[in-house]
Amino acid sequence: MAKNTEISLRNKVIYSVYVRNHTNDGTFNAVAEDLDRIKSLGTDIIWFMPIHPIGVKNKKGSLGCPYANKDYRTTNPEYGTMDDFKSLVEKIHAKGMKCIIDVVYNHTSPDSNLSVEHPEFFYRKSDGNFGNKVGDWSDIIDLDYSNKELWQYQIDSLVMWAKIVDGFRCD
């Protein structure tokens, strides 16, 4: 944690959940059924690894990587609906815990909604095509933050999520 982090936050227990692998069902509702056990471990904060849809283009393996985000403003339908996630967060809060989510704001999947709606938000290779600066990460394309409209898009995304969750882990 940062040196200026509020003292009360420094000794909190954070429990990481990757929804897809947390239970056999791999859903928000299944995680909700496990909250009593998670709380009994002394958990103060549940941190969800990326909960957004996973891109299909160039995906790694049969399931793809959750860090190849397809849409910043919704949940992975394999995990459940946005309402399912909101309900899960309400249950987390009812048990006296907080909730944070991963935000992966350096790149998206090549087939992300942003690559279609805002191609100007992306880094381009010398040939003009989308690309990334880490060659073996073929399932992602890098964002280009020299475009200030991208900053506003991401701020708006964070504001949307901040109405639901308590914080973020920035990847």
Describe each region flagged by the PLM.
Residues 3-13, 20-26, 32-44, 50-164:
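Substrate-binding/active-site clefts of carbohydrate-active enzymes
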Residues 15, 171:
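Rossmann-like NAD(H)/NADP(H) cofactor-binding core
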Residues 46, 168-170:
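Hydrophobic residues within beta-strands of alpha/beta enzymes
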